[in-house]
Amino acid sequence: MRDARVRDERVRRTELAGAVGDAQRLAADLDGAADRVALVRAAIADANARRDATLAAGASIAAIARHDRYLRRLRRELDAARGEALRAEAHHRDQLGAVDEARRRLTLARAEREVIERHFAAWRAERRKLAERRDD
């Protein structure tokens, strides 16, 4: 019985370690997605500044149209990057819930093992006392 409880606790500890590892990996993915959003926003700001400079310099309609197409493409990339960041955040939040659940299961397994150990310790002590009484 004790071996089963010890094995159960070991399995729960392994599950918790796996969940924590997944959460750390997803946190890194989330940071990467946030970095991509920041890079695209910086590119949009730079493109807007170049477009304004082009307009101030009196550029041709074709050059302005190229800048506008480039800005539209960057905005689509920003939308995609923001969507990716939101999905990564939701996935990370779900994984944190899985970590909490694994931690709860480990705590329960440890508590069950301790209850069993206390029960058998009390049972052994009672048997020892009973044997001592018989000897007297």
Language model features by range: what are they?
Residues M1-D136:
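Charge-rich amphipathic alpha-helical interaction elements
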